[in-house]
A protein has these predicted regions:
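Extreme N-terminal starter segment of soluble prokaryotic enzymes
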Residues: 1-5
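A sequence-level detector for short glycine-anchored, His/Arg-bearing signature motifs
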Residues: 6-10, 17
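C-terminal accessory helical subdomains adjacent to catalytic cores in phosphodiester-
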Residues: 14-50, 57-212
Length: 212
């Protein structure tokens, strides 16, 4: 049984979550105990497995499958990551109107639970194993404080801002780049400090079990 399974929108998100977990638990070798199940990842090539597809709609479909339920049972924890920038799409249907970051996170979590239980009631029995990483409005907003200081956590336009502010690393959407961009998350104190600058990042950190 592995420590963590990952169900994310894409491989860039997987790279960041892996570094967060290694930093939070102060164990760089923890990566060997983490496996990406959506999208499946080719560790040798460090890219999405050939024929695999990412994206939020594919992620939603995965959450309702027997394979997802089996992987939750077979792993100590399953982390589900999704950005909220798509929440108002008709196929997701979570309004952002007049919601705080915390309220939006809860609405998105409720929507994901509906998907998990859409074919078979499952969540209530295994909820202690399922951890939600809801990035408002994109995971780049979690990375941004590493490259640009700000009193208020930015929640929109983060990818474009990250591209401008990252001077040493060219920001392109692949695994290796995001592994480098999030490298400082391997340092526990740095991780905790950066998470405190973004409400949705802090919410994810708060959901992580203290010991594994």
């Amino acid at each position: 049984m592995l420590k963590f399974g990952l169900a994310c929108e894409g491989v860039t998100d997987q790279a960041v979550i892996e570094n967060i977990l290694c930093g939070f638990y102060k164990d760089k070798n923890l990566k060997s105990e983490i496996k990406a199940f959506q999208p499946l990842f080719d560790a040798t090539q460090q890219k999405q497995l050939e024929g695999e597809f990412g994206g939020w709609e594919i992620l939603l479909k995965f959450l309702s499958t027997k394979r997802f339920r089996q992987e939750v049972i077979n792993n100590q924890y399953m982390i589900i990551q999704i950005d909220t920038d798509i929440s108002e799409h008709p196929n997701f249907n979570v309004s952002q109107h007049n919601l705080s970051v915390e309220e939006l996170i809860e609405k998105v979590v409720e929507r994901l639970i509906l998907e998990i239980d859409s074919k078979k009631e499952f969540y209530s029995k295994y909820k202690e194993r399922i951890i939600f990483a809801i990035s408002v409005h994109s995971l780049e907003c979690w990375l941004l404080p590493l490259y640009k200081s700000s009193k208020n956590g930015k929640i929109s336009g983060c990818f474009e801002t990250l591209q401008r502010e990252s001077k040493k690393i060219k920001v392109i959407k692949d695994y290796k780049t995001y592994e480098k961009l999030s490298h400082d998350f391997l340092k526990y104190k740095k991780l905790i400090n950066i998470a405190s600058k973004n409400s949705s990042f802090q919410a994810f950190i708060n959901r992580l079990p203290k010991k594994i």
